[in-house]
Design a protein with these regions (language model features):
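Catalytic toxin/effector domains delivered as secreted proteins or via bacterial secretion systems
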Residues: 132-135
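Pol beta-like nucleotidyltransferase catalytic core
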Residues: 2-104, 108-129, 139-141, 147-409
């Protein structure tokens, strides 16, 4: 009888240990999904202890922003690592348990099998990122859906679109704010470098003896609908008598552009900020901000709607092709501006006398996308999830996503 009692106690002890082990294991699985790699497996036990010691480990007290990989796994692409206004940006995946946000470029899950097999804490914010237009993603990379980012995998979106959770424009504070700070001095310095070249036989209704040149650098000639359309529009401008210096892969003269002196590059009055997509929401790239504005050139815009440009650009800073019935009408207007320094300088009025809207834009552009993400993350902004990143990203105008070259109404 005594022996039976001892065995009963032993069996109860073993069963209790098994039940406890099962409970601990189930709790572990419910809190996070196990990683595939051994190093991450080892991290889970230590991370579990850290989470217990720290208490609630919300995104607001984690300061790492983990970029899962470089776009297309190309090391020279993507955001830089380092300080991001209170956060630290990194590509080091060992920081995954300590990341408040994990940013995925749309190409980053190409090599991953779903459902997600790596570590994920319920308090982490998973962010979908893109700086490419849907037109390019569909027709250039043949991605017609973002299935791996669907089913509530993503919490926030971070793109150039103003309806993103995190607005990440191409413009950065080093462009617009620096220009406004320098004001008239910046304008005088830039305009002093503009030159004119002789042109004759243009059959214009206004007197002209000299005209400035227009610059365009492009290497995407026919990949997309927008690529083809902008080439045709530029050809029409040249045919109408507008001198345009065209460089890049489309014209087999990349090296010639690199050989231009700094004075030559600064001499252009206008830049063709022609995007490779038409009417994609808010799609304004470095063509507008760096190639034109930063160099003191008036951007001549084709691609984004005029409404979108007015929303994102300084007041009165650009010329839009939609305001002209034909390329010939635009060419005539640009040639006129070259003869009238007062009229040309009006396009820089936003620098000397910025209106309220322009000043508000300048404040907006102080923060880059990752800096804005950090601020939102640390402020513990309410979390949510997107049922479908595909639905968000491809929710565009027919003009934007179509492959048909003719203009679609």
């Amino acid at each position: 009888m005594r022996l039976f009692a001892k065995w009963s106690v032993f069996v109860i002890f073993i069963l209790s240990a098994i039940v406890a082990a099962i409970y601990i294991y189930s709790t572990e699985v419910s809190n996070k999904t196990f990683p595939l790699d051994i190093m991450s497996l080892r991290r889970i036990s230590s991370s579990k202890k850290q989470l217990t010691n720290r208490g609630a480990n919300t995104s607001s007290n984690r300061t790492y922003i983990l970029f899962w990989d470089h776009p297309w796994s190309v090391p020279t692409e993507g955001f830089s690592e380092g300080n991001m206004g209170g956060c630290t940006g990194t590509y080091d995946r060992s920081k995954l348990p300590d990341a408040g946000a994990v940013v995925f470029h749309y190409s980053n899950l190409d090599g991953e099998s779903m459902p997600w097999k790596h570590y994920r804490d319920p308090e982490q914010i998973f962010v979908f990122s893109s700086h490419e237009s849907p037109s390019y993603v569909i027709h250039g990379e043949h991605r017609h859906a973002m299935n791996k980012f669907d089913d509530h995998f993503i919490n926030w979106t971070m793109t150039y679109r103003t309806d993103s959770d995190v607005f990440a424009p191409y413009e950065q504070s080093k462009v617009m704010n620096k220009i406004i700070d320098e004001g008239g001095k910046w304008i005088d310095n830039k305009l002093a470098k503009k030159k004119k070249v002789a042109v004759a036989n243009l059959n214009l209704s206004f007197p002209i003896s000299f005209v400035s040149l227009q610059l365009w650098v492009v290497s995407n000639c026919a990949l997309l609908r927008g690529s083809k359309m902008r080439m045709k529009y530029t050809d029409a401008l040249v045919k109408a008598g507008l001198p345009v210096d065209r460089f890049g892969g489309c014209f087999n003269n990349k090296d010639e552009f690199k050989e231009l002196s700094a004075d030559d590059v600064e001499a252009y009055k206008f830049y063709l900020a022609f995007e490779n997509a038409q009417y994609c929401k808010d799609y304004m790239t470095e063509k507008f901000w760096y190639n034109a504005i930063a160099h003191g050139r008036v951007p001549v815009v084709w691609g984004p709607s005029k409404e979108d440009v007015e929303k994102l650009a300084p007041t009165g800073s650009f010329i839009h092709t939609d305001d002209f019935k034909t390329p010939a009408d635009l060419a005539k207007y640009l040639l006129y501006l070259d003869t009238n320094d007062t009229a040309y300088r009006e396009y820089f009025k936003w620098v000397e006398n910025p209106d309220e809207k322009t000043l508000e834009l300048a404040k907006t552009y102080v923060l880059t996308g990752p800096h804005r993400l950090c601020k939102m993350m640390l402020s513990n902004r309410g979390r949510k999830s997107h049922p479908s990143a595909s639905e968000f990203f491809y929710n565009e105008t027919t003009n934007c996503i179509s492959s048909q070259e003719n203009v679609i109404k």
